């Protein structure tokens, strides 16, 4: 298993090197801070949607396969969300704290997952990874926002609190969802490869992940780490260990291939989404704790992801 760990660690290490490099670049001010804000918009509206459309539109997929993938990944989501709620009750956490723990346990950094899937499996890894994205993004957002809406008594007025309808409307406009949905339509109808469109989106998509990983690193704020240890440990154990373990056993019980299982486990094993901070701030949850969970999970995942994938390889 040690040899598998080292081999996988070396294969996916460029992903984490780019994250570290992004953080170092922000610290020394090269490029200027304004660059990261502009690049985030470029990534969100152009590069990642192009990447997702390019790969999803060329994948062969049936509705049965899609249903199986949904059962596998959503089983893990259900377990960790439930356990985070139970942990919040057992430890007597305020809604502000346990909703941050829940976000840290349930949400996923899809960009790190896509980068790892691409490093290990190339284009077919990116294509299947995009399918798991389209399953997870709507469900996670609806579950998280509905829970936070019903449990958090925050000081801001109701007008500034997103409702479920706001979330659904944002999901409909989400460029990732639109790109994947368009790609799925083309895939299901069996349309021919459109050379101009696919070559263009392929070129744009090739720039997406490197810039995205640098941006993830640039947005990590180590100085803002909280000293509230127990909630961080709970969220990290649930996200980095429990989530992928549950997904692995469900995938095995449903006879998914090793490739399909590995992609599902990668999405389960990556750290929580950086956007969790924005949602915590909107709802008046514990933002410093959320920042700490995000930062520490990224650091821990450097080790936990290769270990989990090495276990799969054996």
Q: What positions do the PLM features span?
A:
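Alpha-helical transmembrane segments of multi-pass small-molecule/ion transporters
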Residues: 1-314
């Amino acid at each position: 298993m040690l040899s598998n760990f080292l081999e996988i660690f070396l294969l996916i290490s460029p992903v984490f090197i780019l994250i570290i490099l992004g953080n170092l670049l922000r610290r020394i001010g090269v490029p200027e801070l304004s660059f990261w804000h502009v690049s985030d918009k470029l990534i969100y509206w152009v590069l990642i949607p192009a990447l997702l459309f390019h790969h999803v539109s060329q994948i062969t997929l049936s509705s049965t396969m899609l249903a199986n993938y949904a059962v596998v990944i959503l089983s893990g989501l259900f377990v960790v969300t439930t356990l985070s709620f139970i942990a919040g009750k057992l430890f007597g956490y305020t809604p502000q704290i346990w909703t941050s723990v829940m976000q840290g346990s349930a949400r996923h950094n899809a960009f790190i997952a896509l980068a790892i899937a691409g490093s290990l499996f190339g284009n077919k890894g990116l294509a299947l990874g995009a399918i798991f994205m389209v399953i997870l993004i709507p469900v996670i957002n609806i579950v998280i926002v509905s829970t936070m809406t019903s449990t958090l008594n925050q000081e801001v007025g109701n007008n500034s609190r997103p409702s479920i309808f706001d979330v659904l409307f944002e999901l409909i406009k989400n460029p990732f969802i639109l790109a994947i949905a368009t790609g799925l339509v083309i895939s299901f109808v069996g349309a021919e490869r459109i050379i101009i469109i696919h070559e263009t989106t392929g070129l744009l998509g090739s720039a997406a992940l490197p810039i995205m990983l640098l941006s993830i690193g640039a947005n990590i704020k180590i100085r803002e780490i909280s000293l509230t240890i127990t909630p961080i440990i709970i969220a990290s154990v649930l996200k980095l260990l429990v989530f992928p373990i549950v997904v692995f056993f469900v995938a095995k019980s449903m006879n998914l291939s090793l490739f399909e299982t590995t992609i599902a486990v990668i999405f389960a094993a990556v750290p929580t989404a950086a956007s969790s901070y924005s949602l915590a701030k909107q709802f008046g949850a514990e933002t410093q704790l959320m920042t700490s969970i995000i930062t520490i999970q990224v650091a821990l995942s450097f080790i936990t992801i290769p270990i989990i994938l090495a276990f799969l390889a054996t």
